[in-house]
Regions:
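Loop-helix junctions at membrane interfaces
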Residues: 1-198, 202
Length: 203
């Protein structure tokens, strides 16, 4: 009987059925949390977001490919949200440059998966602790790169439009990181450290 040859490695699917399923499920959860408002937790002075948590979960459960895919979809959803109902900062970024706005929304979300995967695989501690640490780092990556990208790309034009110094814009962004980013990171770390997350398996 003639053997059926296996397809060459380069023609194999980029993602397995399991990875595609997890990516779709977590992307759907991200969009649901954003549309319904359940992805925002009211704190004393602001709202913390947990929209990045599905990206972190996907990275830990199924590896960096899934994390990147969910992060891209998270970023695309954020970009579409800026077109529909932008915040004051993102409204300016959108008016200044649609490409800059897309970069600010999407690229930091991709980096979440890269940071989470690197830390989760290398930390020499128990699963719950390294999950919490990786989640905190992933959340801070999202906040710092998002606001940092805004500052680098449109910080100077924003300062000129508002009649303030670039240093004042930088101070404002640092304040947002402290007031929003740190509580969000702590919330993410606590939530994920309490969830049992299994090791990603080779398929």
């Amino acid at each position: 009987m003639e053997k059926i040859s296996q397809p060459p490695q380069e023609y194999r699917s980029f993602m397995s059925v399991r990875e595609l399923t997890i990516s779709g499920l977590l992307a759907g959860i991200t969009i649901f949390l954003g549309i319904t408002g359940y992805g925002f937790i009211p704190l004393i002075v602001m709202n913390a977001t947990i929209l990045h948590i599905p990206t972190i979960i996907g990275t830990i459960v199924a590896g960096p490919k899934v994390g990147v895919v969910v992060g891209v979809l998270f970023g695309l959803f954020s970009f579409l949200q800026t077109l529909r109902a932008p915040s004051l900062l993102m409204q300016f970024a959108l008016q200044y440059s649609v490409l800059y706005d897309a970069f600010i929304c999407i690229v930091p979300r991709i980096c979440i998966a890269l940071v989470v995967w690197a830390l989760y695989r290398r930390l020499p501690c128990g699963t719950a602790l390294r999950t919490g640490i990786a989640a905190v780092a992933g959340s801070l990556t999202n906040t710092i790169l998002f606001l940092g990208s805004f500052f680098l790309l449109v910080g100077a034009p924003y300062a000129a439009a508002r009649g303030i110094s670039v240093e004042a814009v930088g101070a404002m962004i640092l304040g947002i990181v402290g007031m929003n980013g740190v509580p969000e990171a702590l919330v993410s770390g606590i939530i994920l450290s309490l969830i049992h997350i299994s090791e990603p398996t080779r398929l």
